[in-house]
A protein has these predicted regions:
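An alpha-helical appendage that flanks or caps ligand/catalytic pockets
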Residues: 1, 115, 119-160, 192-279, ...
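N-terminal beta1-alpha1-beta2 module of alpha/beta enzyme domains
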Residues: 1-62, 164-166, 285-288, 313-319
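Flexible, glycine-rich active-site loops centered on histidine and acidic residues
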Residues: 2-17, 77-143, 191, 196-199, ...
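Hydrophobic faces of well-ordered beta-strands that scaffold small-molecule active sites
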Residues: 5-9, 37-39, 68-70, 98-102, ...
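Active-site mouth loops of central-metabolism enzymes
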Residues: 7-19, 73-80, 162-173, 252-263
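Active-site beta-loop-alpha junctions enriched in small/polar residues
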Residues: 8-12, 42, 73-75, 103-107, ...
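Short, acidic/polar
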Residues: 17-29, 86, 170-180, 261-271
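Acidic (Asp/Glu)-rich catalytic clusters
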Residues: 30-31, 56-65, 87-97, 182-183, ...
Length: 320
């Protein structure tokens, strides 16, 4: 299976005063052969961030090669009919390059309150929304009467270019999230996990899919991986630690990120590959003004190691 590496600017690299930064971000991806560009989702908050669906329409226009996706979209806060229309439009105009990844949203109840949605029901809302969106993409006339959403004899156009429908990736590192992927998802995009946790979660995904008579592609296991490249490993760890958005109390952040020299980062990515992951979304653990340089280094020194399947990635990483 081939490995694909995409990138997300992260909470500290989504621009600011210069709207042209998004064009520059796309140019980095095209210049260095990244597979895809992803944007995170925050509806309210003081931290500067773009609305991802709107911003990704610009990405689709700036590049005719890059795939693009949400990493990840807080699905319970969206109307699934409107979102299905938005994603179908993006996918149609980009000729099948849209990769929707969704999740339950943040633990902070502020966004749920602001959007008029109960946090208590977010898991059930997500499951129902995924089923409804997929029907709207695949069927001409849809009637749905569920616990949270209702529509009668509706259709959306255009239909997505990606047939039968864009794959819906689901985030979350819990057992419940892995089981949700198996029940209703098409892929797992997980963050803040160790390679061993990827291996165990992957087993849960495929076991749950089998229980529900579903098939998930072997290469639809992905990792959102924080990283920082530096020849000085100790300084890299000290710097990157300040930019870990949601540190885990039970695991040091270095166990579920890639921080240090090029060889170390390549080895860490290979550990995830060995655990069954083939898709990666890398995020620089650094200030926004340094993010572009880090993405360029990753694109120059790491991406070619994994996007060229004919040569061992470890052999190439160890070359002087």
């Amino acid at each position: 299976m081939s490995v694909a590496i995409g990138y997300v600017p992260g909470a500290f690299g989504q621009g600011g005063r210069d709207p042209n930064f998004l064009r520059q971000l796309v140019q980095v991806g095209d210049t260095y052969g990244y597979d895809s560009l992803w944007l995170s989702d925050r509806i309210v908050g003081r931290q500067w961030s773009l609305e991802p669906i709107v911003a990704l329409s610009m990405v689709a226009a700036y590049s005719d090669r890059l795939k693009f996706g949400t990493s990840v979209l807080a699905l319970p806060l969206r109307n699934p009919v409107v979102l299905a229309k938005q994603i179908a439009t993006l996918d149609y105009l980009s000729r099948g390059r849209c990769l929707p990844a969704v999740g339950l949203g943040q633990e902070d109840p502020t966004e749920y309150e602001a959007c008029g949605v109960s946090k208590v029901d977010r898991g059930q809302r997500t499951d129902e929304a995924i089923v409804l969106m997929r029907r709207l993409w695949q069927e001409d006339r849809v009637t749905h009467e569920g616990a949270f959403f209702t529509c009668h004899d509706v259709s959306i156009t255009p239909k997505p270019c990606f047939q039968p429908s864009p794959p819906i990736w689901i985030g979350g590192r819990t057992i419940a999230a892995a089981k949700r992927v198996g029940r209703v998802g098409d892929g797992w995009l997980v963050s803040s996990v160790t390679p061993d946790e990827v291996r165990r979660g992957r087993d849960i995904v495929f076991a749950t899919a089998a229980q529900h008579q579903r098939v998930i592609e072997d290469d639809h296991i992905g990792v959102l991986l924080g990283y920082y490249i530096s020849p000085d490993g100790q300084k890299a760890v000290a710097k990157a630690a300040s930019f870990v958005t949601r540190p885990r109390p039970d695991v040091p952040f270095t166990a579920c990120s890639a921080v240090g020299t090029t060889a170390h980062i390549a080895e860490r990515i290979q550990q995830y590959v060995d655990a069954g992951a083939t898709k990666f979304v890398v995020r620089p653990l650094c200030p926004g003004e340094e993010a572009m340089a880090q993405l360029a280094m990753m694109g120059q020194e790491i991406v070619p190691l994994f996007h060229t399947p004919t040569v061992s990635t470890m052999d190439k990483a160890r070359r002087p």
